[in-house]
């Protein structure tokens, strides 16, 4: 099938005001199979540490590696196992690893065998490496009520360390969990009564179960962004967002503004279902924020989703909008993480522009701002022509590739199934070479079909494949973000 597209358009100009560009990241999804509720932290020793829920719900595991991708094959160490009776003899859910004042702490939800009695619990580890540390139990976190509680996380704002967690609010009949916050006296004891900052009161938070859970915090641009997950743990599972000013009174529920729509949901096109229970980490170079989450690679589940073992850990780059807010985009397809291609050239039609997927017929209307997924592409290597070629596959429309129209400089998007001859595959294949205007930090894409011609932005702001005139190399040069 050929899309009704004559050109690939360019997204609206990128503003350097608040959204800072950072290099592309290179990971392969899924990162770790059968590991839900993932938590990855980069410690000051340069190592990445990983923990997550295992399908048996019977132990706490840790991994470490010097890269995020390295966690995939890193050996796993069991640092705590389910007990025979009492607290910790039931479910073992959603551990998180934190380093506080020279010691390691794991926040985890523990149950009691034969009872639906799940509470947030803390372990303390002494030692430089948490995989070999000496671990002791600090006990259940005592809150306002002795009710179902889980998913504790911690962060520091304005010199105060806070705990945020999910708990059943006894004043709200029929709801499973709300989000609460309190300052910490020490890593296992809250100070003063907690306050609720979010209840599952929106329709998308109440599908299957009425849930707000899995809080995670990232602080940027003078604001505190708190993500959480909602609804049942099947394909309806999704993520919401609370936002507060960094200088706000975080114990005042009015300081937290809830987004009225979910910010990260299932995507049929990319075949990613039930994304959620996220955390944040940073790339190896420290320049990009990384979204860590779980989902499944299929929609339909037989029986209770909690009995399905195939939630898996995934990672992708978190982008930032001009206004300083996070743009989560969509759960990207399996395989290499996609990139954005920012044009290097200066000028009104090109400065800071991104290549985008475009479906409107005509010559390429450049008005409006492209959705993030439409500006993301997987650099498929080897490309459709094989060898050292690469092909640019759309993230928002997987299986669709950038190709040169035969006998023309124009570019269109074509389904890979229609590229069924060597010549057609060559029209959608390029050789990645050092950037023509910046060979140190950028790339250019030379046509396999027409060597010496390059993917480029023409003077009208349209993407084309053509020869490059002296002084216009920047229009054929792209920064990968």
From Swiss-Prot:
Thermal dependence of catalysis: Optimum temperature is 50 degrees Celsius.
One Gene Ontology molecular-function label: alpha-L-arabinofuranosidase activity
SUPFAM superfamilies, alphabetized: AbfB domain (SSF110221), Arabinanase/levansucrase/invertase (SSF75005)
Applied biotechnology uses: Sequential addition of Abf43 followed by Xyn11A increases the degradation efficiency of birchwood and beechwood xylans but not wheat arabinoxylan. The synergy degree is high up to 1.21-fold.
The keyword Signal is assigned to this record: yes
Chief localization: secreted
Site, Important for catalytic activity, responsible for pKa modulation of the active site Glu and correct orientation of both the proton donor and substrate: residue positions: 151
GO cellular component terms, A-Z: extracellular region
Regulation: Activity is significantly inhibited by SDS and partially inhibited by Ag(+), Fe(3+) and beta-mercaptoethanol.
GO process annotations (BP): L-arabinose metabolic process
Catalytic activity: Hydrolysis of terminal non-reducing alpha-L-arabinofuranoside residues in alpha-L-arabinosides
Gene3D superfamilies hit by this protein: 2.80.10.50, Glycosyl hydrolase domain, family 43 (2.115.10.20)
Matches recorded under Pfam families: AbfB (PF05270), Glyco_hydro_43 (PF04616)
TM regions (residue ranges): none
Compartments in which it is found: Secreted
E.C. code: 3.2.1.55
UniProt KW keywords: Glycoprotein, Glycosidase, Hydrolase, Secreted, Signal
Family per similarity comment: Belongs to the glycosyl hydrolase 43 family.
Xref: PANTHER family: GLYCOSYL HYDROLASE (PTHR43817), HYDROLASE, FAMILY 43, PUTATIVE (AFU_ORTHOLOGUE AFUA_3G01660)-RELATED (PTHR43817:SF1)
Role according to the record: Alpha-L-arabinofuranosidase specific for the cleavage of alpha-1,3-linkage. Shows high activity against 4-nitrophenyl alpha-L-arabinofuranoside, debranched arabinan, and sugar beet arabinan.
Full protein name: Alpha-L-arabinofuranosidase 43
